[in-house]
């Protein structure tokens, strides 16, 4: 792990694409870069680096939690994308119960 979000909390937010990821991380020499913020699963490969966003374990456009498992061995790694279905109705109802500010904006963006 080179840099975690708590060390660089204000990195630029860009629309995920191979071109944007290559440009954003051009100063990094890595086989794998795991990124986030966007709640959708993305995987890009420019033959030198794989850029992987495992998605969101909550707010996304389906009733599932999405995450990734990265297994690292001596000279290689593998990525497994996992989707776990769950009943998100209680989760969504909690936004009203807790009076979450900007609920409409959040739902428009992520559900």
Residue ranges with predicted function:
Residues 1-32:
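Conserved catalytic scaffold of divalent metal-dependent phosphoesterases
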Residues 45-111:
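Acidic, His/Gly-rich catalytic cores of divalent-metal-dependent hydrolytic chemistry
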């Amino acid at each position: 792990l080179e840099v975690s979000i708590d060390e660089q909390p204000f990195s630029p937010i860009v629309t995920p694409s191979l071109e944007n990821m290559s440009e954003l991380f051009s100063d990094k020499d890595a086989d794998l870069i795991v990124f986030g913020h966007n709640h959708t699963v993305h995987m890009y490969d420019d033959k030198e680096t794989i850029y992987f966003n495992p998605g969101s374990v909550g707010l996304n456009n389906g009733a599932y939690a999405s995450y990734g498992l990265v297994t690292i061995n001596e000279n290689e790694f593998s990525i497994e994308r996992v989707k776990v279905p769950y009943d998100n109705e209680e989760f969504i109802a909690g936004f009203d119960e807790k009076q979450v500010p900007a609920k409409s904006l959040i739902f428009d963006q992520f559900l």
